[in-house]
């Protein structure tokens, strides 16, 4: 367990799941109002200090438990910073070295740094920087109302960022220009602009050459439903552009997605229930099943409620470390609220 137990882990609140559900539902509703924000100005990246409190156990009820199906908990961090723009983390990509990362705030900010480890456990964040995400004119995306940045995908030195509220994807030459890169909008696929408000683009995955769908950017909505009630997805570029669907089950919505080294897609999903509060799960989808017109589904690797060390988990990244282990990194969106947390959690996936 964490060294300092958050107030909602107290006996009274942890037993009152209905109250927790109401709390989180209210929080998500308030985020719409909170978007009336002070807009950032284009400026050099700011070096920031990030304080990290260890999360030593994932199962609050059984702190000694490390194995969760095919996933083994490595450790985690609860992150805090006095920097005013820190928070709201909605996506993350961790480099192949397992240390350097870049993340997004849903208010239109980059957050990058380096994870330091004690053995295999995350132990802190160093070399942290934040900067506003820039549009094609060199001004912050937020200045044009494009601040709901929710997803990120990587193709070598190119980054793709999805902006939910305006149903837009922008491309950055991050490898050459770093945090000063300007985003260039790419043409949206058919049906993209008709996604519902605040339930639009939530996950991006780029498929590298050599895999099925190589060269394709996969985009998945949070809860843009087709006629059958399944979640809408899109294939941009690559050999087979078009639309597909992810089978929706148990009222879960999509939060993020990441590609496994072998090619399958992991979906991070989230559900709010009036009875059980907040729930998250990770589902595995075969890449070969994703094609225009298909409805895809797959096994659940992890499902967790508030009896586990979770918050509003929104970002998922996968990398293979020097030892050949497949490592999952998750990050949460604290909605800039003092009673929520920015959690960074890591698991090792045992490949079947």
State where each predicted segment sits.
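Sec-dependent signal peptide recognition
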Residues: 17-25
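Sequence/structural signature of beta-propeller domains
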Residues: 2, 7-8, 21, 29-352
């Amino acid at each position: 367990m964490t060294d300092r137990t958050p107030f909602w882990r107290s006996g009274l609140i942890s037993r009152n799941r209905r109250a927790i559900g109401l709390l989180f539902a209210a929080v998500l509703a308030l985020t719409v109002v909170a978007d009336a924000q002070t807009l950032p100005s284009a400026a050099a990246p700011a070096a920031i200090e990030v304080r990290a409190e260890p999360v030593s156990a994932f199962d609050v009820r059984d702190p000694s438990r490390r194995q969760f199906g095919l996933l083994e908990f490595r450790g985690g961090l609860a992150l805090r910073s006095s920097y005013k723009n820190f928070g709201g983390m909605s996506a993350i990509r961790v480099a192949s070295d397992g240390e350097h990362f870049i993340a997004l705030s849903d208010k239109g900010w980059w957050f990058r740094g380096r994870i330091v480890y004690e053995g295999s456990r995350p132990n802190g964040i160093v070399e942290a920087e934040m900067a506003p995400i820039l549009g094609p004119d060199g001004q912050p995306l937020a200045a044009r109302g494009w601040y709901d940045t929710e997803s990120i995908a990587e193709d070598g030195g190119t980054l793709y960022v999805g902006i939910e509220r305006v149903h837009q994807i922008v491309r950055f030459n991050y490898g050459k220009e770093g945090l000063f890169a300007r985003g260039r909008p790419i043409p949206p696929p058919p049906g993209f602009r008709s996604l519902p408000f605040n339930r639009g683009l939530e996950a991006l995955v780029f498929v590298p050459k050599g895999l099925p769908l190589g060269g394709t950017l996969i985009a998945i909505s949070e809860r843009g439903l087709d006629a059958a009630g399944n979640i809408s997805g899109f294939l941009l570029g690559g050999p087979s552009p078009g639309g597909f669907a992810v089978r929706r089950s148990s009222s879960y919505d999509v939060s993020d997605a990441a590609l496994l080294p072998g090619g399958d897609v992991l979906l991070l999903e989230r559900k709010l229930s009036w009875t059980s509060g907040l729930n998250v799960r990770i589902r595995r989808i075969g890449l070969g099943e994703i094609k225009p017109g298909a409805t895809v589904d797959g096994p659940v690797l992890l499902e967790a409620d508030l009896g586990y060390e979770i918050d509003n988990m929104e970002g998922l990244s996968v990398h293979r470390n020097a030892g050949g282990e497949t490592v999952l990194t998750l990050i949460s969106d604290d909605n800039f609220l003092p009673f929520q947390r920015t959690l960074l959690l890591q698991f090792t996936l045992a490949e079947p």
